[in-house]
Amino acid sequence: SAITVEKIDTTLVGSIGYVFRYYDGAERALNGTGQSWKDVTEGVLHAGQGYIFQASMEVYLTVRGDMDSGMQMLTPASKEIPVSENISNYASNQGWNLIGNPYPCYYNMNGIDFKSPITVWNKDSWTYDAYSILDADEYVFAPMEAFFVQVPQGTETIHFMPEQRLAKAALVDGKWTTRSMRSVSGCRSLI
């Protein structure tokens, strides 16, 4: 399902500028980092694809969905997200994809059928953090949270198993995870 950008409300104070961008892994594979973020020009955000939201000041997004969007959490089907290898002459630039949590709910990373590390934006430190299922790391994606993957050659899709959907933030080692409680707010967020 998709959300049109025009239907996303922002609580604005004064006049601010904002933009939604997608990540172009093919551009990175060809030319390295620096020009990989592209403006969303079609006015539609697609479930499963990651985006960055940037604003000239802190704003709060309200995304309204229809009943079909709400039923996505209840469907027994897994979600299959296509990814691109993006072959490059440099291994560090190859295979990068920005994936969005395809469910409108919290999601435990252990439900992803993908064994390479995932990289998430840490809005508190303005850095990226890496997590690995193989290293028994724990991470819970918030609704509308995006993350980077560097896909190995031969990988065409990433599967999200429905059993790891969560109605609220999860307990990890007996504590509420702060990342899963994060709001989609601020000047820069991956969604």
Region locations from a protein language model:
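Cationic, amphipathic, low-complexity alpha-helical segments enriched
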Residues: V172, T177-I191
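Short amphipathic alpha-helical linker/capping segments at the junctions of internal repeats
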Residues: E163-D173
